[in-house]
Amino acid sequence: MSSEDGIKKLLDAERTAQKIVADARQDRVQKLKKAVEEAEKEIKEFREKKDKEYKEYESKYLGASSETASQLATNANKEIDTIRNETAANKQKVVDLLIKYAITCDN
């Protein structure tokens, strides 16, 4: 009977060990799933934070660049108008000077 008792104890020990291993595997799977969920949550939060920062940066600097471009265009148009007005005002004087120097010859 002692050999049967020994075999029975070994089988019980093996079942207990298998149960412990199965529980450990199940625990590992659950911990892994939990870790993946937490990582995905952190990634989502990080992505949302960076998207928000990017949109703030974009609105701050791209808005300013369109304003700057508009201001530069306005200034350029003003300068062009000024040059055209000065050209129109001085055109006749320049033509007269050119004619005067073309007609007058100094030896």
Curated annotation (Swiss-Prot):
A molecular function (GO) term: proton-transporting ATPase activity, rotational mechanism
Pfam families per UniProt: V-ATPase_G
Keyword Transport attached: yes
Gene3D superfamilies named in the record: 1.20.5.2950
Entry keyword set: Hydrogen ion transport, Ion transport, Transport
Similarity section: Belongs to the V-ATPase G subunit family.
Function: Catalytic subunit of the peripheral V1 complex of vacuolar ATPase (V-ATPase). V-ATPase is responsible for acidifying a variety of intracellular compartments in eukaryotic cells.
NCBIfam families in alphabetical order: V_ATP_synt_G
Quaternary structure and interacting proteins, as annotated: V-ATPase is a heteromultimeric enzyme composed of a peripheral catalytic V1 complex (components A to H) attached to an integral membrane V0 proton pore complex (components: a, c, c', c'' and d).
Name recorded for this polypeptide: V-type proton ATPase subunit G
Lineage start: Eukaryota, Amoebozoa, Evosea, Eumycetozoa, Dictyostelia
